């Protein structure tokens, strides 16, 4: 008897919108040396190969930090740090080149695998490395000569894009040459950040030891604006002690993610290299699994406050007059303001929606959904829906329902199904207006 998996079918179908959204998008992936040394690395390579087969344009930047520490210990060579950057003298540079070359070959070999009965079967991936990054020395700081430690001077974006257009994966390490023919040791996080910025990448992805950025309670923060990420980074830096005075891999990548987003990279993702399938879950599921640092926008999605009532009234009044929304008084809005989420642009409320929980039935109502006429050509309705879904999940609710007279098809497109009045919570059934005859739709499995 053949094995059948409805979960596989369901997951595959749910991933389809993300497959379409990510196709032909440029992604820079940062693989620190810790990720390469982890037992899960083979699975990470398999997932990167899968992204390549789905049409993503992939640049990989790898690091060498733990491998370098091990080699320095073996050779009993001391390579001190200054302001968090290793001073790379001639002997240290030779060791860095040795490790970087070895890891480049190892990663290339992994990506070249195409054995039957493996996830890489039939992949036939071309991996391209080269002098796409030109370096320059860091120079002298506070009387300390960084020697062969360097920074990115320029990047051959045209050359990289030609390789990506051919569906090749571009693989780059922390060692780059200069216009004088010298080699320099660069911070791999800086290389990845600069590549994402100068390639106008759609995403910068970093594999870290933690599953994203955690708040003070140890909970994963799903999304951060650069300003929020900066506050967290400053807090983490203050917690560093003399015994543990170096930035962690997560902190270094978070710093790069902030810079990338400020420079125009729409999204940077922090995920764990320890968890099997983290990359796929982050990119191809609604909730993701790690932390996203997203570009700040003139539009802000936030919880409504009492001062927003005037703006909400201005937004919903025309819809109430048309009979699309049930009329609400200012007094009612004042009582319910905590239930509202709004999208604000330059001080104007351009969209709103409210969430009314019914915890006994494990349900919540999405009500008073309105978008300003000038802003209905975007995805603001979807943004509000996603925010309310997340809130409902926080309340441990499993279903979201809506009553509508005009937007039946839009809600069905978002996964809602039409039901009869008996599916409503008992309190809502008693208030249902049979003359208005609103359509009832339910979204299950939040």
Curated annotation (Swiss-Prot):
Principal subcellular localization: cytoplasm
Organism domain of life: Bacteria
GO function terms (MF aspect): L-glutamate N-acetyltransferase activity
Keywords recorded for this protein, A-Z: Acyltransferase, Amino-acid biosynthesis, Arginine biosynthesis, Cytoplasm, Transferase
Domain N-acetyltransferase per the UniProt entry, residue ranges: 299-431
This protein's record includes keyword Cytoplasm: yes
Pathway of action: Amino-acid biosynthesis; L-arginine biosynthesis; N(2)-acetyl-L-ornithine from L-glutamate: step 1/4
InterPro entries (UniProt xref): AceGlu_kinase-like_sf (IPR036393), Acyl_CoA_acyltransferase (IPR016181), Asp/Glu/Uridylate_kinase (IPR001048), GNAT_dom (IPR000182), NAGS_kin (IPR033719), NH2A_AcTrfase (IPR010167)
A biological-process GO annotation: L-arginine biosynthetic process
This protein's name: Amino-acid acetyltransferase
